[in-house]
């Protein structure tokens, strides 16, 4: 399981309804490990929740034109020089710093601080780290976990 962390809650914009500018390759919903998500994937509610940070294993990836809750907008990895699982502060620093950066702006079309999206990130857990998982996936939602249709790509929201 990976960990979903919410770190930036901004006011929620009107429901996002857009074209098909960045749809995933999945058309009817495919159960996918969160470590296998890619930028542009849209998906629905996480499979397991336990309070604050949520352990996440599998999600249902759907075409972004279909109703979904989350979208992956950017990804990065811990460098090869990082030997052991970083502490929570290191993960938070990388996740929050990266997910508010240039890749977010390039994908959404507006700086994170001006975006109406709630930004969260998926990070390795101790179990997935031991299996080679080094990826941080930045994801956006409407903040109240409401479902939307269309992609965040180029939305300027």
Residue ranges: model-predicted function:
Residues 5-8, 23-157:
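Primary mode marks residue(s) on the alpha4-beta5-alpha5 output face of response regulator receiver
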Residues 18-22:
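C-terminal motif of bacterial Sec signal peptides marking the signal peptidase cleavage site
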